[in-house]
Amino acid sequence: MVFPEHMEFRYYVTSERKEHFALYDRTLGSRMTYLELTQDLGQCLIDLYDTDFYDAYCVLSEINKLVQTEKNEAAWRKLLELSMPLCKVHPFFGPLVKELSKLESAYAHDQDADAAIVLSFANDFEDIVRDAKALIERCLDDRYQPDYSTAERYREAHYDALLRFDDMRYGELATEEVMLDGPAYDSAYHYSVELLRERGIRTALREVLYPNTVRDLYNYLKAYCLRLPLPIHKCKNCGRYFVVTGNITQDYCTRLMEGSEKTCRQMGAVVQYQSRQMKNPATREFTRSYKAHNARVRYGTMTKAEFTAWSKTAREKRDACVAGKLSLEDFVAWLDSDKQR
């Protein structure tokens, strides 16, 4: 076989609200992990919302054509080359690789081969992307209809026909002892407690999903996030959605601003501070006069040294005005005392 023969895909959520994806081969003697990703719970929903999947859809179209043609080693190698890189685009492509492996195995052993799941993957994935966008905008964003509960927002989204799926059913669930510091294909049941401790390998009981289809994977994640509920906000700086991991009132994400080493959250704090300051009339008057005096330097009617000295005194008087030690009228009069006619 070209594909690993005994592939498995699993998903679980940790106690720290991290989502874990793994695609691995269970074949004895050649066990390998092909995808292992741990990230903040709900990040894959954000990625469904933000990512341009045009190139991926083109690859899926090519995969469908190959699956419907005569199967030979060259075709399976091409399918492997096309499908495996998709896992780096989004972890939801992992179940597709697993299904292609299962399909090749059926052909190799002259078993009934049903390509329906593979052939429907592109349409299912496209529906998932659309559903995820409505889920984020209308259900998980708690600032949309804030007087509604998550369940009520979900019901309204259904009534408005924005969600693509009528239910949240999913595949096989199992509670397992997961090795937190070992490869995905390995199992704690192969080792004694003493040996695991000696090797420094931690384990934990987790509810693990083994999806039969990508719909199973999405439905489980969707249901999990709705039950919590998982809050998602739109960043007030870049306008993109992000998962709220701390303070529920967060307004800014942690993405780097374009062309900057600062994040939206770091810059957002500055913007908030400036906004609060500008609400004070003394600060507004200082800013107005500061700009006017700075313009004089550019026009050559004031030296830099004079501007620096003026700025130092102006800041001191502004602070005194804000503290109530100087009246606003006296402060404005001082600012305008050297006004040029």
Q: Residues of each region from the PLM?
A:
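Cysteine-rich micro-motifs
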Residues: 247-267
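Short linear motifs in low-complexity, proline-biased tails and propeptides
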Residues: 323-329
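Extracellular/mature segments of secreted proteins
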Residues: 261-262, 272-274
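Short loop/turn segments at secondary-structure transitions that flank enzyme active sites
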Residues: 241, 259, 270
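Short helix-coil boundary/hinge micro-motifs
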Residues: 1-242, 273-277, 281-296, 304, ...
